[in-house]
């Protein structure tokens, strides 16, 4: 496929991480949803210090542009569904349970700076050849992965006559222990067999983006299990 065009965002998945950026295995550590408006990933860049060589007569003898420092992405998720499970995984705010043990709400508490989550997204790809693959398939998607997002925090919320949009902010970190991940997100062979990432991100990377023929998971309004990858070896 050449020059893919990105259409609308389809599906998002978040996964709970431990304080070292590793996926937490278990039944209540993932969440998949599609009821959101947008995800912004804004680069956080610190300008480098320029060096100017200036002679006594005022003439500039040389100039070296400072190298900017990329600190990561400032993440902003605008979403609609008030899911206690999603909010608990991304912010650390505890879930409020009903008489039957089902999640019915959440508490807003102190910022859990030691908590973290991974953020994955699938966006539709437009093109004449998105379904023209040897292994068949249902199309193609742009897949992006932020393997370590920290400092999840809910933003302002105003409830009135208009539709209510909630906002989650966070910041990425490099490194971590995502590895090749606990999920099958791309084709592992020419037959289109679903498999995990072929290689992990390097220690200085904050995001990975690629085209995949593996369809996103189905959205469900409840926790989803994290059982693949490192979980299989533990």
Residue ranges and their predicted role:
Residues 27-69, 85-103:
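Short N-terminal edge-element motif at the start of the domain
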Residues 106-159:
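Short helix-loop boundary/capping segments
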